[in-house]
Amino acid sequence: MNAPHMNDTAADAATLDDAAAPAGRPALTRREQKEAYENNKLFKRIVRQVGQAIGDYNMIEQGDKVMVCLSGGKDSYAMLDVLLRLRERAPIDFDIVAVNLDQKQPGFPEHVLPEYLKQVGVPFHIENQDTYSIVKRLVPEGKTTCSLCSRLRRGILYRVAGELGATKIALGHHRDDIVQTLLLNMFYGGKLKGMPPKLQSDDGKNIVIRPLAYVKETDLEKYAELREFPIIPCNLCGSQPNLKRAEMKALIREWDKRFPGRVDNMFNALAKVVPSHLMDTTLYPFQSLRATGEADPQGDIAFDEEPCASGDDAAAPGAAQPISIVQFDDL
């Protein structure tokens, strides 16, 4: 059965419950009206993008039990919030259970997530595992612990998913995370590899989904502020930040400011791969390629540089301007 798509009616309804002014409140000022309008657009956009991603990749199906991994950060809060809204209007039935892994980091506020989850009325499970001590014992002081911590966390969450009978594991990675991963793998790993919106886990037993795949991080930051989620800091472990990922994040933010549409184009390119124009012999049979003698309108242009966009293509609103290819005579 198809995954849930958001329609206009559902998107219109996906605003804050308290967005409407209480009876007897003075009329909103023009500034307040503009802010309310922009906030409403933000809510609709995020819900629409999550619904679209779910539908495009068939992330959630009839009868699924979705385990939403909740860390206490803005992304996982937003993911849970939007999935609960979508479930109310989806054409299929599916269950949601929120799961938090308490890794016994010093200063972690154990009461915050249970109180929040009880308030919103969603079933939840808190898994208590002291991975913090393991990581501190194995990783030298001052080194980044994120890689080992992630591996330990992944294995625990896979086990918990099986124990809870979850059919899908939902993670809160967003558009910027996906582009950052692509750049990290290109710059430091020498490979074209991103972060898929849906995958089979390495243990072969779980399907992992990323419903926020189409959502910008800046939108999630605004959403979390407006929804007033009880955010838990992500640096309680005392680990050094991942400097390479921080570098990619800063680069993407700078591009978004200076070259509107560039990051969107990079993200969209991940869904428009042309293996015949790359160099991976496992994806395209270059070695056995022979001339067929028949013209192909979609064939390669061997001698001319291909422009970034044809002159007939209308640029999407906010998209980066295509780069013109200028030919120079040999000197």
Swiss-Prot record:
It is found in: Cytoplasm. Transmembrane segments: none annotated. The keyword ATP-binding applies. Binds 1 [4Fe-4S] cluster per subunit. The cluster is chelated by three Cys residues, the fourth Fe has a free coordination site that may bind a sulfur atom transferred from the persulfide of IscS. It catalyses: cytidine(32) in tRNA + S-sulfanyl-L-cysteinyl-[cysteine desulfurase] + AH2 + ATP = 2-thiocytidine(32) in tRNA + L-cysteinyl-[cysteine desulfurase] + A + AMP + diphosphate + H(+). Pfam families: ATP_bind_3. Signal peptide: none annotated. This is tRNA-cytidine(32) 2-sulfurtransferase.
